[in-house]
């Protein structure tokens, strides 16, 4: 990461896509996509996804590292080319507890990530805990971030410390996605970004972390990009020029969250304007979902009724029976909620792929389709971009390859934006 940031600050047009997903097919796609390049791949886990208690994936940071490495070994991607990051590390998971208890858990969270070899650490203590004012004072956020930084420094080996990088600040909304429709988004003001940096510098120095400050490579800000269930707010470069000019006076770059569904031109403009770390998550699993739904339609027409996986129906049944991951985000009417379950850009389906019923139905569908020849006309109907690549000899009509290539479409846009 340090080399990439240095190259960007030296004037090169270079950035990096941060893959924020724990889905094995998404991680496989991210690694396979860059297997034959010289680029490193940045894969990040969030604090609610992966933590010392397992998170919603059931994985600790060390488990997640081994999970990613196993996929890398399978696809032939060198482990040393993987950068592991921890996103929103702080009290996000424990906001219902008082600050002392939440921060105690947050300290152990950060230590677990660093011990596991994660080298890009987002210190985010912006969340109010039980009894805290809303919002927190910037000074409090910075002081808590300094506590977390001290925790990271205290367990890092000399070798790890050479690789360790920190990201400070946060975007709006808080991690997890928009819970309601958006019409506009508040772009971070320069004075707020400057205050974030100033308060963190003061808090770090007060804790004896002056050296750690040199490892702060990025600030999270809101450049004016966001999405909800069916709306996308696109990057307007002219609106972010004050931010772009301010960061040039520092040794850092910006990290932009929620960049999913922007155009490839927007990604290039974002990197040009020093938003050099572009995070993506739901767009990748949305592409995965699109591919699986397309294959489910093909299965519906090619496979006898008694042998079909009922993949889409199983997904809907599970999500309706177990609504905890989507209920507070989606609309309430039955038809509306069903549309959101299927097609929301927020893609809350991503929380359900590990469910045993859904996992088994997807596996059944894949086995069914691997045993038949899929007519080209059907691929043209349901996966038209993949049809074109089959025609040009770049791709085979194999279900797994079709899913991979669908995810590659998202990664291709980021490559265009980030490539030197």
From Swiss-Prot:
<dbReference type="InterPro" id="IPR012062">
    <property type="entry name" value="GatZ/KbaZ-like"/>
</dbReference>
<comment type="subunit">
    <text>Forms a complex with GatY.</text>
</comment>
<dbReference type="GO" id="GO:2001059">
    <property type="term" value="P:D-tagatose 6-phosphate catabolic process"/>
</dbReference>
<dbReference type="GO" id="GO:0019402">
    <property type="term" value="P:galactitol metabolic process"/>
</dbReference>
<comment type="function">
    <text>Component of the tagatose-1,6-bisphosphate aldolase GatYZ that is required for full activity and stability of the Y subunit. Could have a chaperone-like function for the proper and stable folding of GatY. When expressed alone, GatZ does not show any aldolase activity. Is involved in the catabolism of galactitol.</text>
</comment>
<dbReference type="InterPro" id="IPR050303">
    <property type="entry name" value="GatZ_KbaZ_carbometab"/>
</dbReference>
<comment type="similarity">
    <text>Belongs to the GatZ/KbaZ family. GatZ subfamily.</text>
</comment>
<dbReference type="InterPro" id="IPR013785">
    <property type="entry name" value="Aldolase_TIM"/>
</dbReference>
<dbReference type="Pfam" id="PF08013">
    <property type="entry name" value="GatZ_KbaZ-like"/>
</dbReference>
<comment type="pathway">
    <text>Carbohydrate metabolism; D-tagatose 6-phosphate degradation; D-glyceraldehyde 3-phosphate and glycerone phosphate from D-tagatose 6-phosphate: step 2/2.</text>
</comment>
<dbReference type="GO" id="GO:0005886">
    <property type="term" value="C:plasma membrane"/>
</dbReference>
<dbReference type="InterPro" id="IPR023436">
    <property type="entry name" value="TagBP_ald_GatZ"/>
</dbReference>
<protein>
    <recommendedName>
        <fullName>D-tagatose-1,6-bisphosphate aldolase subunit GatZ</fullName>
    </recommendedName>
</protein>
<dbReference type="GO" id="GO:0009401">
    <property type="term" value="P:phosphoenolpyruvate-dependent sugar phosphotransferase system"/>
</dbReference>
<keyword id="KW-0298">Galactitol metabolism</keyword>
């Amino acid at each position: 990461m340090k080399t990439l940031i240095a190259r960007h600050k030296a004037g090169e047009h270079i950035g990096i896509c941060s893959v924020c997903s724990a889905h094995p097919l998404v991680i496989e796609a991210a690694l396979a996509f860059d297997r034959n390049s010289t680029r490193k791949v940045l894969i990040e886990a969030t604090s609610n996804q992966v933590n010392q208690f397992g998170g919603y994936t059931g994985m600790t940071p060390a488990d997640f590292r081994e999970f990613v490495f196993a996929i890398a070994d399978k696809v032939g991607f060198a482990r040393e080319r993987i950068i592991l990051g921890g996103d929103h590390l702080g009290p996000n998971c424990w906001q219902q507890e008082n600050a002392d208890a939440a921060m105690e858990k947050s300290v152990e969270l950060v230590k677990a990530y660093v011990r596991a070899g994660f080298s890009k650490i987002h210190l985010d203590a912006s969340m109010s805990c039980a009894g805290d004012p809303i919002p927190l004072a910037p000074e409090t956020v910075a002081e808590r971030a300094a506590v977390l930084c001290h925790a990271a420094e205290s367990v890092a080996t000399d070798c790890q410390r050479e690789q360790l990088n920190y990201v400070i600040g946060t975007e709006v909304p808080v991690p997890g996605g928009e819970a309601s429709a958006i019409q506009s988004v508040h772009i971070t003001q320069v004075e707020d970004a400057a205050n974030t940096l100033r308060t963190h510098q003061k808090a770090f120095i007060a804790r004896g972390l002056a050296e750690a400050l040199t490892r702060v490579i990025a600030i999270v800000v809101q450049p004016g990009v966001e999405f909800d269930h069916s709306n996308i707010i696109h990057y307007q470069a002219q609106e972010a020029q004050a931010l772009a000019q301010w960061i040039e006076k520092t040794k850092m770059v910006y990290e932009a969250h929620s960049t999913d569904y922007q155009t490839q031109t927007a990604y290039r403009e974002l990197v040009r304007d020093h938003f050099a770390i572009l995070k993506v998550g739901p767009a990748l699993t949305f592409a995965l979902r699109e591919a699986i739904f397309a294959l489910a339609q093909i299965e519906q027409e090619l496979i006898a009724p008694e042998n079909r996986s009922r993949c889409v129906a199983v997904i809907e049944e599970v999500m309706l029976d177990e609504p905890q991951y989507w209920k507070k985000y989606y609309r309430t009417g039955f038809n509306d909620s069903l549309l959101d379950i299927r097609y929301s850009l927020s893609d809350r389906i991503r929380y359900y792929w590990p469910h045993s019923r859904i996992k088994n139905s997807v596996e059944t569908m894949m086995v069914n389709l691997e045993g038949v020849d899929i007519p080209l006309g059907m691929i043209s109907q349901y996966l038209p971009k993949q049809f074109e690549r089959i025609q040009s000899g770049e791709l085979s009509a194999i279900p797994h390859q079709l899913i991979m290539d669908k995810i590659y479409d998202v990664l291709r846009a980021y490559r265009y934006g980030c490539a030197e």
